[in-house]
Amino acid sequence: MLIYKYIYGPVNSWRLGRSLGIDPISSKRKACTFDCIYCQVGKAKSCSLKRRVFVPTEKLIKELSSIPKLNIDYITFSGTGEPTLAKNLGSMIKEIRKFRKEKIAVLTNATLLGRKDVQRELKHADLVEAKLDAPSNDLLQIINKPHKSISVKKIVDSIKMFKKDFKGKLALQVMFTKDNIAYAEEIAKIIKSIKPDEVHLNTPTRPCGIKPASKEEIDKITHHFKSLRVVSVYDKRKRKKTKPISRKETLRRRGKA
């Protein structure tokens, strides 16, 4: 039986369909620029902006090459931290392109999108989903607990800068909790200034100790985003059946399989 260290899923994603996860961090401790209150991976020992190689590209490619034939829609970079902290993220994407035909997505908190090296690497992805949970620095501290150098303005400016040259699909996710749902209109105003291709309205549905917003609460605030293409975690769409190749690794990164 093969043991997978860097790959998890595939899972049924309400955003991406059948999604096979790639974790370019794959460390026992979360490595992130945020320490979000709703993160199912757990708490970060500290937040860092330093990029480094966590998983050698050749090891990831060897593991990906060994998986059985799967019917998937996306290969998605996400997992035990912020994917753009992986210094070899670009080489991973390019090597995967050589032998896989599926679309590639990267889920990022957007804190490093202002960096030219990160922009160059992400241009090879089909979809980049950035995150914006707070319209103010006070809320950013409460919800995302970022590295001390990060501000809402820096995040928004970084996303706008990235969008200028990105040829793929840019989505923005908002994770709504009791702390920010009253600020939906303010968040929507900022997102409209960014003009993403799609907005994903989310709430913590995985085990994390934070109570999710109800379907009624999410439906109630959706009108603030009416000029944008919106997808909600509560949208009724037929989910495609999937079975993870490694239940253990999937549970470790997602809290559920």
Protein language model features and the residues they cover:
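Glycine/small-residue-rich loop that forms an oxyanion/phosphate-binding "nest" at active or ligand-binding sites
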Residues: 72, 77-79, 96, 105
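Auxiliary Fe-S-binding modules of radical SAM enzymes
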Residues: 2-15, 26, 62, 68, ...
